[in-house]
Design a protein with these regions (language model features):
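Immediate flanking context of iron-sulfur cluster ligation sites
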Residues: 35-60, 67-93
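Phosphate/ATP-binding catalytic cores across multiple sugar-kinase/actin-like superfamilies
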Residues: 223-231, 313-317, 446-468
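Glycine-rich phosphate-binding loop of actin/hexokinase-like ATP-binding domains
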Residues: 174, 182-200, 261-277, 312, ...
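Glycine-rich phosphate-binding loop and adjoining helix at the ATP-binding site
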Residues: 196-201, 254-312
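Conserved phosphate-binding catalytic cores of ATP/NTP-utilizing and phosphoryl-transfer enzymes
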Residues: 133-160, 292-327, 348-360
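Fe-S ferredoxin-like electron-transfer domains
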Residues: 1-8, 32, 72-163
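Acidic, glycine/GT-rich loop-and beta-edge segments that sit at the periphery of enzyme/chaperone cores
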Residues: 3-8, 90, 105, 109-122, ...
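Glycine-rich phosphate-binding loop plus the immediately following alpha-helix
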Residues: 187-221, 297, 301-317, 376-416, ...
Length: 568
């Protein structure tokens, strides 16, 4: 058995500085084996250390400082840190192995990203959905989506609640909502604890394939359990009708314990695409007993790159098309798509005709950059890795990068090729009232991400037949806080879409509620909404066309065309 050592953790942030007594910051005393790295104990105690590299020691984001009992630096640390930093006790949490009792200082509050958004802005004020029969038929079952943002103490009633979960790569957001009114009873949000294995899905796929799959599953289950524990204080047993979880394909596979190897290598095939239903006991291995038993639904995915979060968002925005039994790109009909198809009605056919010109585009400007375009009868989706360019970096959140880049262009400190002018080329530009510098490499990362997004939008538009797009919806936290004019200025969005862009907030979370509500409705009061919901979302999983941009002719040419920072 390995020797146990004690580790005193000193949190170095503004809050702890305000709480200091006699010049000593409050400390947390932890115990761990002397044979393992520091990262697991920090992770177990929710002391989040940012990581882009999946604990390989490449990114240097998990740096900590030993003030007592520093271990000898590893070869990797000698390569990544300066001699002065090593003498001062700085080490990398993912590779250093404390051998004796020690004291460690870690920076608090430095893991900055786009704020978590839980709101949804329905587009009813900008588009008259009632004039489109397809959408009108769906609105009849979605009165509960007239969401109220009230959070009063009197909102606990003797009826049922739905737990909605947005299982993001970066964050986890949960809400408990009244099943009938849609009223928010409680909200829980936290950073995704899997981030210690990397900030992107490819890092987590690699970690899972290297033996960390069960730990990744446990991490997210513990996160969900913390949310449920908070919600338990607001209800009595068996008041929850069900829970619906919407996440990208990798996050959902990791949660369900599926093999994710197929998501990271060609031909990129998910283990399962359709809607999943499991019991709460099965998901948590009978460890959750304080909220009663209820079904847990996992939103279906469309491909390895476009997951349940997008399907849920499309469901919330009434964008899922009605195929009417047509053969899809996958050469299968709606009727044989897992047996969930339904007959096309005369009303559907009439609505499809009225809906031909209502072309809408949904873009989720997050880590995975998912996009979908539809004319009401046909839908095409794709995704492109935006990576950490749209995530936090020190004091600079992703939306600030867009706005600051546009500002530098206007001031002439940055040219259209993305090159910083002197004297900023070597050192970068210091942000006002901050120690953060916006450097040349930050601009290059942003250029690559925005070029990939813009090229993806162009390919979807061309594949749909180059129609006039009536509306672009920006989903997620990044889109919610985005300065749209700055996005036009750098060429992230087409300039001819001015006046047609709408930030719609967290469509994944709202869609998880709407889908969970409709799926549970039949079991609560005998309505048929559940059957229709299953049909709608499974048709999305098996009937929507998906494009792999890496294999698409012309993508590289478009990517290079949109690399420049200019309005177009």
């Amino acid at each position: 058995m390995s020797e146990k050592i004690k580790i005193a953790i000193v949190i170095d942030d503004e809050k702890s500085n305000a709480d200091k007594k006699d010049g000593v910051a409050p400390s947390l005393i932890l115990t761990q084996d002397a044979s393992v790295t520091l990262m697991p104990v920090l992770l177990k105690n929710h002391l989040m250390i940012g990581s882009f590299c999946g604990q390989r020691g490449d990114c240097g984001r998990c740096i900590v400082q030993f003030t007592e009992g520093a271990p000898l630096p590893t070869g990797l640390e000698r390569a990544r840190l300066t001699p002065k930093e090593l003498r001062q006790g700085y080490r990398l949490a993912c590779v250093t192995r404390p051998r004796m009792d020690c004291t460690i200082k870690i920076a608090g509050g430095n893991d900055v990203e786009t704020p978590i958004v839980t709101e949804l802005n329905l587009p009813s004020e900008n588009i008259d959905l009632s004039s489109h029969k397809i959408l009108q038929s769906r609105n009849q079952k979605s009165d509960a989506m007239k969401f109220s943002e009230k959070r009063g103490e009197d909102s606990i009633k003797n009826n049922c609640y739905i737990i909605a979960v947005d299982l993001g790569t970066t964050t986890v957001a949960m809400q408990m909502r009244d099943m009938v009114t849609g009223e928010i009873v409680d909200t829980y949000c936290e950073n995704n604890p899997q981030r210690c294995y990397g900030t992107d899905v490819l890092s987590r796929i690699e970690a899972s394939c290297n033996g960390a799959g069960e730990e990744l599953r446990e991490l997210i289950c513990e996160s969900l359990a913390r949310g449920l524990k908070q919600f338990a204080g607001r209800l009595r047993k068996r008041q929850i009708a069900g829970m619906c979880i919407a996440g990208n394909t990798t996050m959902e596979h990791l949660l369900l314990g599926y093999d994710v190897k197929g998501l990271g290598v060609a031909p990129f095939v998910p283990v399962e695409k359709g809607l999943q239903k499991i019991s709460l006991a099965a998901l948590f291995s009978d460890r959750i007993t304080f909220v009663g038993e209820f079904p847990v639904y996992i939103a279906p995915c469309i491909s390895a790159f476009v997951g349940g979060d997008i399907v849920a968002g499309l469901y919330a925005l009434h964008m899922l098309p009605i195929f009417g039994g047509q053969e899809t790109a996958g050469e299968r009909t709606v009727e044989d798509a897992e047996g969930t198809g339904r007959e096309r009605t005369a009303e559907d056919a009439e609505g499809a005709g009225q809906n031909e010109t209502l072309v809408r585009l949904l873009i989720d400007l997050g880590t995975n950059g998912e996009m979908a375009i539809t004319d009401g009868r046909r839908m095409i989706v794709t995704a492109t890795a935006a990576g950490p360019a749209f995530e936090g970096n020190g004091d600079l959140i992703g939306t600030d990068r867009i706005a600051f880049t546009a500002s530098l262009l206007r001031q002439g400190a940055l040219d259209e090729t993305g090159l910083l002018e002197e004297p900023y080329f070597e050192t970068g530009v210091r942000m006002a009232k901050s120690e953060c510098y916006f450097r040349q490499e930050d601009i290059r990362a942003l250029q690559m991400a925005k070029a990939a997004i813009r090229a993806g939008v162009e390919i979807l538009w061309e594949e749909m037949g180059c129609p006039e797009v009536e509306r672009i919806y920006l989903a997620g936290g990044f889109g919610y806080y985005l300065d749209v004019e700055a996005a036009f200025a750098i060429g992230l969005l087409p300039s001819d879409m001015r006046g047609k862009v709408q930030a719609v907030g967290n469509t994944s979370l709202a869609g998880a509620f709407a889908l969970g509500r409709d799926l549970c409705m039949g079991s609560v009061n005998g309505e048929a909404a559940g059957k229709t919901a299953v049909s709608d979302v499974n048709m999305a999983a098996y009937g929507i066309e998906s494009i792999n941009l890496a294999e698409r002719d012309g993508f590289e040419k478009l990517y290079l065309r949109y690399m420049n920072l200019e309005e177009n």
